[in-house]
């Protein structure tokens, strides 16, 4: 299970002038993107209207090859759209805005790729195109199904229209929802994300939705929802159990780190063997959600990503710290609560996995971006989590937990790196930790232990 890493999206951002992934997005006025989407999963027809304010008079953007731009305008005046060529599955476009005009309307659409049911767990970790089918549609943030506003982070509002029997979800706050009473009606929903976002995922499916409201100490509420297939929703007690456990995890991590940063959290069933954590939701395969151990492990991992990865953003250029920290505070912490032996067995598993990584696949933790194969998981999850085990042992539980609370308070909705984590732990412990972090972050290998002398007495 992991947060969504978007290599295609990031490759586009790196090509945009003036974009700095490591800057703190909350400190600047962010561009806003408004999308109106119509999708028919049966025919896979997709049409969209985008409203945005480009940062420059000439707006360059890319869309997936299945999508064509049909119109562009400013204040009702039509503009020419120039096709700039292709780059793999991407088509590049350019629009020149009139002087003094900024709010651009783009209309585009096409027929999306059919949902590929042959994808296995490794396949869904690769870059995916926007896909649709009646059993489920997935438009990933890195799938180029909307024009990137020209900045690493932005805010958005998305309105979705679907045929009756289908429902949609987008990470963020559900503003409104209309569920048609008649078979020929249209489902409509609007979502917004006011925090800095680096992409937009859209999911749709024939879901049954259950909702529960929990109150915070501040008086505000959090909405918990399950978006389950009819079969999954009909499983006795399953949806309620997911809602119960989600509440438990939210309360646990709010106490350990700080208040939950969003207004809702949803567990969404998909037709593919996915396990993605996104802001305000987790998107898991329907078959995965049936497994009895998921609520006791993976669910908590995904909930915690709303603090680490989706609450404090990862500076991917300097290494993904969030998977190791989340594995330590979720998966490993659950084993510690089970027993000392269970925790020991997990640590041994990490060591075995690391020892099995071929020498050619070894890389420092500063080079880890996302889990694309087993070797990457052994490093970015196991070795990274072990770093936090050793760090807690070195500075003590009290200083360790104080550092995490400070790190959260300081970097909420900002991009943070390993160096920022190091500073938080140094401040909380009152001791230099450069040597510790250097040896575990910068080196690809592990300590070589040898016996130089041995003796025995009778």
Question: Which residues are covered by each model-predicted region?
Answer:
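Juxtacatalytic substrate-recognition/specificity segment
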Residues: 50, 90, 131, 158, ...
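Extended, low-hydrophobicity, Ser/Thr/Pro/Gly-biased non-transmembrane segments
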Residues: 108-207
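Acidic/His/Gly-enriched intrinsically disordered linker/tail segments
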Residues: 194, 293, 317, 323-390, ...
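Amphipathic alpha-helical substructures
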Residues: 377-458
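N-terminal, polar/Ser/Thr-rich
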Residues: 14, 20-47, 70, 128-130, ...
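A surface-exposed beta-strand-loop module
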Residues: 66-125, 182-185
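Beta-strand-rich binding/interaction modules
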Residues: 59, 69-75, 169, 434, ...
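Surface-exposed beta-strand/loop patches in extracellular or lumenal glycoproteins
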Residues: 49-67, 144-163, 419
